[in-house]
Amino acid sequence: MITLRKRSKPINLNMIDTDLSIILFLQGQDWATPIMRLASSLGSLEFMLLSMPFLYWCWDAKQGFMIGLMLVTSHGLNAVLKVALHGPRPYWVDPAVQAQSTQPSFGMPSGHAQNAVSIWGLTAHLIHKRWAYLLAAGTCLLIGLSRAYLGVHFMGDVLAGWGVGAVLLGSSIKAMPVMEE
C-alpha cells in the first residue's frame, strides 16, 4: 500500500485510484449532467432551508420544527467532521476530474449525502408510508451519485455522509418520544 502524507494523516492511494476511476466513468456520461445537477440540488443546504417555511407553516409545525432541528444538527456536525477529517476533494487530487462546482471546504464526509439521509429519511419516517420511504431511498442514492458525478466527492465521502446521516436519523427517531413530551 502506498500512502501520501498530507497534514500528518495518511491517504490510501489505492482507494483514491478506485474512487477516481468511478468518478471518471460517471463523468463520461454527458447526458446525465442536467439530471445530476438537479439531484444534487435536492441535497443542498439552500434547497432545504427554502423548504423549511413550507414544512413548518403548510405541513405540520411540530414536524417542520423537528426537521429544521435535524438540518441544523446535521449541518453543524458535518462542518466539524470536515475540519477534523480534512479529506481532499477529487479535483484537488487529479486534474482529469471535471469539477462541476468548486467547494472551499474539505470533502469528507459529503454534506449533501449526510443531509439527504437525515432530512429525507426523517421526512419519510414522519409521513410513514411505503412510497415516502422509497422516494427517500431513491433520492438519497441519486444525490450521492450526483456528488461523485459532479466531481466534488469521492464515493468514500458519500458513503461516510450516508453513514453519519443514518446515525443522526436513528438517534433522532429514538429520541422522538422524549422530544414529544
Provide a role label for each language-model segment:
Residues 51-52, 57, 65, 75, ...:
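Membrane-embedded catalytic cores of phosphoryl/pyrophosphoryl-handling enzymes
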Residues 24, 65-66:
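Residue-level detector of alpha-helix boundaries and kinks
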Residues 66-81:
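N-terminal signal-anchor transmembrane alpha helix
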Residues 1-47, 79-105:
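N-terminal transmembrane-helix/juxtamembrane module of multi-pass inner/ER membrane proteins
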